[in-house]
């Protein structure tokens, strides 16, 4: 899968500039080199990459959902206190075709955040942009409000504990069993994945999760897999800049259940 050197450099520059808005974390390990855009997965030259203040996404104009959404969550951001409510809306920075609120109306599917609003409560702009449909997929309500949300909480706890966590998640299409919704024909995913990366002070640690788009209410450990397993499923390198490839091959839940 080819990369876009020029776009990737611009994206890294954007992310580096965005970091200037974030205060240094007391958890930071001075021995760890900061790698701008470490959360950004490998992407192809035909992907529509959108960089917002709190997350970066690849929007798919065929499925009308993001292929992936990636963000770094710091300890300070995980403690954000803003609680403004915004309507879901079309992302003005992407071209048509794109999903709208009407496509989800009366379908029985949640407008499921990929980068959760609770991770964006450190900035009004980041919070508002989390409601763009470039960050939304149709999700089963029980899964979205229970098992998926538990993994979101786990991510915030890890960010507070280690200082920051790099996160990438997105939909998985296998059988297409749920078809499409709305006039625009938004594709409903069969599953979702989420991959987490952090530095513990002693080395990089990762964990992945794969969850079916159906009622799910179990504990995160029951959905845990290696990042390599997710990459094999979706055919994408999730952390191409990670210096330690071995960290993707295994996972230990003890690093994620503090």
Give a label for each model feature:
Residues 17-258:
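Domain-level detector for secreted/extracellular nuclease and nuclease-toxin modules, and
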Residues 1-7:
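Bacterial N-terminal signal peptides that target proteins for export
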């Amino acid at each position: 899968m080819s990369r876009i050197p020029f776009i990737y450099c611009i994206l890294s520059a954007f992310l580096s500039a965005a970091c200037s808005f974030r205060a240094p974390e007391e958890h930071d390990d001075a021995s760890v080199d900061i790698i701008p855009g470490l959360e950004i997965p490998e992407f192809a030259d035909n992907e529509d990459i959108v960089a917002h203040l709190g997350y970066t996404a690849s929007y798919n104009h065929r499925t009308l959902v993001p292929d992936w959404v990636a963000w770094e969550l710091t300890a300070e951001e995980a403690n954000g206190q803003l609680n403004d409510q915004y309507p879901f809306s079309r992302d003005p920075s992407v071209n048509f075709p794109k999903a709208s609120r009407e496509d989800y109306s009366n379908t029985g599917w949640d407008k499921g955040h990929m980068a959760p609003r609770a991770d964006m409560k450190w900035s009004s702009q980041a919070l508002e942009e989390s409601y763009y449909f470039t960050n939304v997929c149709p999700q089963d309500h029980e899964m979205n409000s229970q098992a998926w949300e538990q993994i979101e909480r786990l991510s915030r706890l890890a960010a507070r504990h280690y200082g920051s966590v790099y996160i990438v998640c997105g939909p998985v299409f296998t059988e297409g069993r749920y078809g499409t919704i709305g006039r625009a024909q938004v594709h409903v995913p069969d599953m979702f994945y989420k991959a987490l990366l952090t530095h513990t002070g002693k080395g990089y640690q990762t964990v992945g999760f794969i969850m079916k788009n159906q009622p799910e209410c179990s504990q995160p450990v029951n959905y845990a897999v290696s990042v390599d397993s997710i990459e094999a499923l979706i055919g994408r390198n999730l952390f191409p800049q990670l210096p330690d490839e071995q960290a993707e091959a295994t996972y230990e839940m003890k690093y994620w259940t503090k």
